[in-house]
Amino acid sequence: MNERSLRVLEYNKIIHMLEDKCTSSLGREKLKELKPISNFEQITTWQKETSEAQSILIHRGNIPLGGIHDVSQYLRRTEIGSYLDPGQLLQLKETLAAARRMKTFLKDDKKESTYPIIQELGNNISSLKHIEDKIELCIISETELSDNASPELRNIRRQISSKNDAIRNKLNSIITSASNQKYLQDPIITMRQDRYVVPVKQEHRGNIPGLIHDQSSSGATIFVEPMAVVELNNQLKELRLKEQVEIERILMEIAAMIAERSDDIKSNQIILKELDFIFAKGKLSVEMRAVEPVLNTNKKISIKNGRHPLLPSNKVVPNTMWLGEDFHTLVITGPNTGGKTVTLKTLGLLTLMAQSGLHVPADYGTKLAIFDQVFADIGDEQSIEQSLSTFSSHMTNIVNIMDNVTEQSLVLFDELGAGTDPTEGAALAMAILNSLREMGTVTVATTHYSELKQYALSTEGVENASVEFDVNTLSPTYKLLIGVPGKSNAFEISRKLGLSDFLIQRSKELLTREDIQFEDLLQNIEKNRSTAEKEKDEAARLRMETQKLREEYYEKKQQLQTQKEKLISDAKREAYKIVKQAKLDADEIVENLKTLRAELEEKEMNKKIEEARKNLSDQMGKLAENMGEKLVLKTNKKPPKNLKIGESVNILSLNQIGYVILPEDANGEVQLQVGIMKVNMHVSNLERIKEEKDTKKTGVGKIVKSKAENIKMEIDVRGQNLEEAMLNVDKYLDDAYIAGLTHVTIIHGVGTGVLSAGLKQMLKKHKHTKSFREGEYGEGGMGVTIVHLK
C-alpha cells in the first residue's frame, strides 16, 4: 500500500489506538506487521476473527489475557542446557497460566460453534499444569527458592539455621563478656564477606584474637572474626555452598522439564500473541461502535452514517456516501472548513481499516470495495528543501499517482488544480478526472472551481456533491449532499458580515451572464432541496407520531385485555380458594371424628393388653418360684457386687439382658425388668455388663477437626491486587483461627511492596492477630509474612 497515503490519511494513529488495546508486548509486536492488503479471502478471514472477538467481548466481558510475557529467550536458554533464575521462572509460570486460563475460558463458551476461528486457536493451546505446579512448589519469590523444593534443600537450610544460631551464641558470649567490652567499638554482631565478625577498636586489635576481614572508612574500627568461630564460619560456608549446589540442581531439573515441552510452549506463545492481537481489534470495534463491512471486488462503495474514527464521537457528524454503481467519479464542492477534506479522509481511512481486517465506524449494511492501491493527495506537504510551491508539490504527487494508478485503485484529490491560475487549474483538473474516468478508476475530488461543477453535470459517470452550509448562521453543517453541486455563498456571507449592498451589487455586475445564471440555478436547486428536505423531515415526523399513537392504542387495548383476564383469573382463584377451604374444613371434621373413635377403641385395647400383661407376669412369677432351682443351675463364681438401679446385667440361666429396678436384698436377690416382665434373680445368676464410653466427637469439635484437616499453613496472594488479597487473607485468618492454628504464613512476594505494606496495615488491626513478622532466611524473607494467631 502507498506509504504516503498511509501517512496523510493518519493510518498510524489507528495502529496506536490498537496498541493501547493490547495486553502484552507480544500483541504489540504483532501489530507492527499490520498493513492493508488486497487479498479478498485473507481480508474476509481477518474481518471474521474481529467479529468473533467483538461478539465474545459483548457477551462475556473481559478476556483473561493478563500475565503474558515474551519467554522466547528463556526457552532458548533451557534448550542449550542452561537454567533460569527464579524471577524468569515466575514469568514463564504466569505465561503458562494465562494460556491455560484462556483455553478454559474459550472451552466454557456455550456458543463456541459461533466462534470457529478463535475456538480453533483455543483448542490448539497445550495445558502444561505440571510445569506450573513444579514452579509453584519450588519458587517463593523472584530471588528465593522454597524449602519445599526438595528434602535435601530443607535439610541443608535446617543445618544452616542451626549453625547460624551456634555462631551467634558464641559471639554473644564474647561481646557480652565484661572483659571484652572495652575492646569493642559496639557490642554488635555483623557480617563481612559472608562471615560473622565483631567491630573491634583499632588500638585493641590484638586483644581479641581472630581474622581481620575489613575496617571502617575512618580506620578507627576493624572487623574481626574471632578464632572461636572460625571453624563454625567455615562449616557455615560449606553448608551455603552445598545449598547453592542443590538450588542449581533443582533449577536444572525445572529447566529440563521446560526444555522437554519447549515446542508446546512456543506454540502457546504464538497463539497468545494472535489472540491478544485479535481481541485488541475486537476492543477497538466495541469502543468505536463499529461494524463488519460487506466487502466486494467490483468497486462498489456504500457507507451508511460513516464517522471519522479519529474525531471525538460526540462531535463527529455521520455521513452517508455511495459511488461505484451509476458513477465512479465524485466531485465535492463547498466552502472552506465545510468538511470536504474530512469526508475525503473518512472514505480513505475506512477503506484502509477494512483492508486491514478492522471494523469500520458506520451503520450495518455498509459496503466497501477492495482496492489494489489507495492514492491520496491531501494537504499542503510541499518540500522547503526542494523549493517546491504548493502547486508544484501537489502536481509532483499527482504525476506519481497517474504513473501507478490502475482501474482497481481508489484515488482521493483534495483541492484538485489549486495553487495556480484558476482557468488553467480547472482545465488540468478536468483532464485528470477525465483520464481516470476513462480508465474506470474510482475517484473522489474536492474543488472550488465552478468549471468542475459544470463538468460533473455534463459528463456521464461523474456526479456532483457538496457539504451543506447554513447561510443564516454562517457555519457548515458538515452534511454531505450527493447529487447537489456546492455553492460558494461568497456574496451571502459577505452581506452577513457587513459588506455594503453597493459593493456586492458591483461584484455581481462583474460576473459573466453565464456565471450569474449558473449560480442562480444552484441557488434555486439548493432552495428546492432544502424545502424538500424539510417536507421530508416533517412527513417522517408525522409518520413517527402516527406510528407512536398506533402503538399506544394497541398497548392500551392490550392492557385492558390483560386487566380483564386478570379480573376473571382472580375471581376464579378466589372461588377455588373458598371451595378448597370448605373441603379442608370438612376433612378436618371427619378426621376429628375418626380420632375420637380411635381414642375410644385404643382405651379398650390398652385395658385388654394390661390384663394380659398382668396374667403373664403372675404366671412367670409362679414359674420362677416352682423352678427356682433350675433357674440358678448356671451361676457366676464372682457375682456382681453393689448393683445399682438402672445397671444392665446378663441373666446367665436365661441368656437375656435385664435392668436393675430394686437393689440386692438380704437374700441376695435383685428385682429386674426383662422386656415387659419383672423377675427376681439371685446375684449369683447375674453378670454385670461393662458399658462402653461413647468416644465419638460431635458438634463444634467435629467442625474444628474438619477445619484443621483442610486449612493449609500458608496462603499465596501473589498476582492479586491489594483489595482482592485483603479479602482472601481476612477469610483465611478466620478459618485458621477456627481450626486452632497457632501461626500461618502469607506469601505476597516482593514486587513493588504495595501488597506487603497494605496487608501489614490490615494485620495490625485484625481481631485474630497476636503478632506478625517478616520471614527469615529460608522462610521466604521479605516475600512472606509470618502471623501468630491469638
Curated annotation (Swiss-Prot):
Gene3D superfamilies: 3.30.1370.110, P-loop containing nucleotide triphosphate hydrolases. The keyword Transferase does not apply. Pfam families: MSSS, MutS_V, Smr. GO terms for molecular function: ATP binding; ATP hydrolysis activity; ATP-dependent DNA damage sensor activity; endonuclease activity; mismatched DNA binding; ribosomal large subunit binding; rRNA binding. InterPro entries: DNA_mismatch_repair_MutS_C, DNA_mismatch_repair_MutS_core, DNA_mismatch_repair_MutS_sf, MSSS, MutS, MutS2, P-loop_NTPase, Smr_dom. SUPFAM superfamilies: DNA repair protein MutS, domain III (SSF48334), P-loop containing nucleoside triphosphate hydrolases (SSF52540), SMR domain-like (SSF160443). ATP binds at G334, P335, N336, T337, G338, G339, K340, T341. It is an enzyme of class 3 (hydrolase). Homodimer. Binds to stalled ribosomes, contacting rRNA. Belongs to the DNA mismatch repair MutS family. MutS2 subfamily. This is Endonuclease MutS2. It comes from Alkaliphilus oremlandii (strain OhILAs). The gene is mutS2.
